[in-house]
Amino acid sequence: MPIFTAQELAERFNLQLFGDGNIRIHGVATLTQASPEQLSFLANPRYLTQLPNSRAGVIVLHADDVKAASGAVLIAKDPYVTFAKIATLFDIKPAREAGIHPLATVDPSAHVSPTAHVGAFVSIGARSSIGASCIIGTGSIIGDDCTIDDGSELIARVTLISRVRLGKRVRIHPGAVLGGEGFGLAMESGHWIKIPQLGGVVIGDDCEIGANSCIDRGALDDTVLEEDVHIDNLVQIAHNCRIGAHTAIAGCTGIAGSAKIGRYCLLGGHVGVVGHLQICDNVVITGKSVVRNSIHTPGEYSSGTPLTDNRTWRKNAVRFKQLDMLVRRMMAVSKEKA
């Protein structure tokens, strides 16, 4: 495990240090759990009361909170971002040896870089390509005509069905499925006819896709995630969607076919997005919201019913059904008074 002094961290990240610069930091932890050999941070004012009693050797915080701390501190404009950067110094991953495991299966027409790691029980299909320094974890399946660019990682049991292109430094967690058939059906004489899904999936550089998430291939055009998109666990992105660069989508969100989401958007957990609509750049959708219409103005949007006690909720549920009747009565009274 690496060790850094407080002074070394201050110099490395251009931070102002107050206190003992010789304190040696072995790791990171929360304010309540950190030991004198660990670094912590304060980014949310609601945790300010934890600051005086924290045993952390060094705390990253905003200049306004210095007086509440008792030990060494590092001053940061954005303590959360600074903590994230420092934490990466302690996130040491074991090195993977380059080469193809004897229990992997690689089609003769596929290309695997000699610097890539291909784990046990991996299957790589025809005409697929694995770039330099890629890691293809145990049990992953890469179908035909897939391309994985340099430095990308499929952690384990990831499935790329066909016609999937990953950019550089893409990271995909276990159970994710990319390139599955989109949900395309046409009704004829009381029976569904399956519409062939002839497009692919394109994932930009520096994207991350969480465990058990699914991204369907397009019907005609590709389904596209632009660069630096981050997808949480259990997210469904349907065929022909386009997700703009630097957008983040939290768990259990579902995005229906052909929806277009802009750049720098944030979608909270369990959001539903109706198909064939557009969301502009810099939009925040709070958790449990349902987006039924296009959004053309940046900002924060919400829907759904906030949590309340059951007794109040039941009363409000009954009154909600009465809203139309009450509005009509009010309009009638207004007309009579007029």
From Swiss-Prot:
GO terms under cellular component: membrane
Primary enzyme class: transferase
Gene Ontology process terms (BP): lipid A biosynthetic process
Residues forming the catalytic site: 239
Classification via Pfam families: Hexapep, Hexapep_2, LpxD
GO terms assigned for molecular function: N-acyltransferase activity
The organism's place on the tree of life at top rank: Bacteria
CDD domains: LbH_LpxD
EC numbers, comma separated: 2.3.1.191
Substrates-to-products reaction catalysed: a UDP-3-O-[(3R)-3-hydroxyacyl]-alpha-D-glucosamine + a (3R)-hydroxyacyl-[ACP] = a UDP-2-N,3-O-bis[(3R)-3-hydroxyacyl]-alpha-D-glucosamine + holo-[ACP] + H(+)
Entry annotated with the keyword Repeat: yes
Record keywords, A-Z: Acyltransferase, Lipid A biosynthesis, Lipid biosynthesis, Lipid metabolism, Repeat, Transferase
Function recorded in the entry: Catalyzes the N-acylation of UDP-3-O-acylglucosamine using 3-hydroxyacyl-ACP as the acyl donor. Is involved in the biosynthesis of lipid A, a phosphorylated glycolipid that anchors the lipopolysaccharide to the outer membrane of the cell.
Record-stated family: Belongs to the transferase hexapeptide repeat family. LpxD subfamily.
Record PANTHER family: UDP-3-O-ACYLGLUCOSAMINE N-ACYLTRANSFERASE, UDP-3-O-ACYLGLUCOSAMINE N-ACYLTRANSFERASE 1, MITOCHONDRIAL-RELATED
Subunit description: Homotrimer.
Name of this protein: UDP-3-O-acylglucosamine N-acyltransferase
